[in-house]
Amino acid sequence: VGSEMCIRDRLPEEEKKADYFLTFLADELSVEKTDILDFELTVYCKENPEFIGLNDDFISSPRLDNLTSCAALISGLIDAGRMEGINLIALFDHEEIGSHTKQGAGSILLHDMLRRILKELGREQTAEQDLYRSMLLSVDVAHGIHPNQAGKMDLTNKPVLGRGFCIKEASSQSYATDCGAVAVIQQICEKDQIPYQKFVNRSDLAGGGTLGSIASALLPVKTVDIGIPLLAMHSARELMAAADQQALKDLVSAYFG
């Protein structure tokens, strides 16, 4: 043991770190270090989500971006009662790094999947018309207005936590929203009394973007970008209003029918 420690002490610092982790990984998997050819490592915050605030009206949690949207979409699809047409959700990988991977929104995965479904339904010859009549919801979180950075927002289009989900628009088309799709969502919200608000990116500052523009370029259908406003987006713990999650879930359920 003494000679092994002496040899290890003479290794370069980076090699020591790699050796230390490989030893840990090999022990966890009950294999030899030499059996490990490669690995991927992702770091997660393991603290539990919490309701916070005077009336527990806020949620503090890791990964609200974009688990909030995934949860609302899955619930809405399960609750859907409409039997005609196709209800489909796609939970893509790699949105935070550009979406241009084989399982990201920048791939032909969704386009090909819809084509195959239409073919199996005997609608291959009318696929273009079917797609033209379709609509895409791009659901991702939005930056809520921060009390310490209020000047970063357009004063007339600021998303406030607790006032419903956001319909997101941008003249740069970083959000894929078009007026026809907005009208559909607004009508649903007004009919079912679902709270919503509009958010427009400032044209003189770089703002966020979503996979909506990427996906709709490959699948040219009416599209609207929506999502829940957050504070501290991309931090280890993010903050949202619990009522906004209910509003988003209600909208998705009504949208799927």
What are these regions (language model features)?
Residues 31-40, 83-89, 122-133, 189-203:
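Flexible, glycine/charged-enriched surface loops at secondary-structure junctions
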Residues 20-34, 142, 146-235:
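Active-site-adjacent substrate-binding region
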Residues 54-64, 95-101:
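A short glycine/serine-rich beta->alpha loop
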